[in-house]
Amino acid sequence: MQIVKSFVYRRYTLDEVKRKIVDVLQGASTGLSGIELADRTDINRMTITKYLDVLHAMGLVKKKKTGNVNVWFLETGIADIEFPINYVQVQQKLISAILAGEEELARRILLSVLNSDIDQVRVLTDVVLPAVNTVGELYSRGRLDKTERSFLLNLMMEIIDLVKFNVRVSEQKANAHTLAVAGSDDKVHVAKSAAVAFSALGWDSLYIGDVEDQIDPFFDIDLQRYISRMWGSKHGLMVVCIFSSGEGSLRFLSSTAKAMKGRLRGELRIAAIATPELQAAAEENSDHVAKDLLSLVQWAERQYSITK
């Protein structure tokens, strides 16, 4: 009698396969072939080969040709990242890579995290922005010169872009719109991070950039015209998020945005992140003043749940 074995091929997520491969390669200093990885992970060879190519393209694994066989290794900096994700550990590794000027390592660390089952907003609030703050603190203490500071801050903008282009939106929110604008150069990273965070949460999100040098007696008209063009035909909740360390630009931008209330089809809210010194100025024209990005996002999410 012939016995027929039936095989059920399960579908794996990238995160599942990546974890299995990382776990196995961590203990294989001399590397493993695709066949060995398939055996040790209990994933069929065709599937493991496909995912190894994906992880190689992402910069998480590397291969070395030995005869006719590809031997696979973990890329530098990936082997000792803990799963589930330890955000403090990743933050420290990212800061170390950035301060050492190791751009590729910094990107690999972020990519490894972003392609895991993680809270994408926390990657920004608990990993990326603390790294930006560290650069600022080191510069304030005289431990970085102007050129190095510029290089590192530019690298951090690229890191934020890396998060942006790897965002996975589980569900797009209906009638949820945000616009982030910076009123000073030192707030561009948190402003852009806000736009990326809202995008990750399913909002229709815009980032204008730093407009401090654009502010003049007629810029309010220019900004209001832009908001009308982008949101004029839309409905729902509209949140203008303002980030500035300058009292003048903070007042100007918040009052300009507030003047748009009643002129749009949706419900307009003004939010700002401000230090205690600027709290009073921020409160004049804002519906909410947050202490950090996470509290701002949480407030906006609550507003959306109320108005939708």
Q: Which positions does each model-derived feature cover?
A:
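Short alpha-helical segments that sit at the start of domains
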Residues: 1-22, 84-85
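Hydrophobic structural patches
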Residues: 24-25, 52
